[in-house]
Amino acid sequence: MIGAWTVGEQTTEELLAGLPIPAPVIGAHPGVYSPSVDSALLCRAVLGELDRRRLDGRAETTVLELCAGSGIASICAALVGATVTAVDDTAEALAAIDGNATANGVAVTGLLTDVRALPASVTADVVIANPPYIPAPPTASAGHAWDAGDDGRDVLDAIIDALPARVRPGGGVLLVQSDVCGVDQTVHRLDLVGFSAAIVDEVPLAFGPVMASRAEWLEQHGFIAPGQRTERLVVTRAVRDAEV
């Protein structure tokens, strides 16, 4: 976990305990983002999406997780029968994904690359991501797993812009982010690239240590209201047609 964050840890545990399958066993791996509230939200979302596809008669589904970190969402998908590829840009994360998948008795294919350099041939029925999304001042350091440029959208926008080539016909997308970096912007950008989108899940949360440490900077730059110390973590679901 990113430091002591009692509210976040409690919410993470509650979300994982409420999954329709037993929560995956995830080991501690130095240098790799540990499962947190956003990770648990993505797990819940992908399991719901795969269940929806099964009910629609699409039992065989490929899943591509971008910015996979520990691989917990990929492992959830694999546990219910999906064929899964997990992408991250650090060797530490790839080792964690492999180790965690093995510990849970599933196969997850790992790819070591930046999502912006992912070959066009890598596609899937369902693309999921919990990317870095925290706005970061120029002086920020050591925040590879959560910092995402001065507006928090560097990685998120790159993922969205590549979706038309990444998502197979009839497929969908699940993205997790904080409302601090612009949920409406995400929905609008998805619309621009040909996807209908809607918010399908959210959790209000007190700031964790990273957000709290730069709250004053976030206030000064208009990301949060004066005195605000809470955020909403949201899941956006997008599809190629009007059914969201």
Positions of predicted regions on the chain:
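Conserved beta-strand signature within the Rossmann-like core of class I S-adenosyl-L-methionine
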Residues: 170-176
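Short, electropositive alpha-helical surface patch
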Residues: 181-195
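Residue-level signal for inorganic ion chemistry
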Residues: 39, 130, 159, 173
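Conserved S-adenosyl-L-methionine
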Residues: 180, 195-206
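Short strand-turn motif at the edge of the Rossmann-like AdoMet-binding core
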Residues: 132, 176-179
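SAM-dependent Rossmann-like transferase core, predominantly class I methyltransferases
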Residues: 2-80, 96, 219-243
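Conserved SAM/SAH cofactor-binding pocket of Class I
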Residues: 43-122, 126-129, 135-137, 145, ...
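Glycine-rich S-adenosyl-L-methionine
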Residues: 142-168
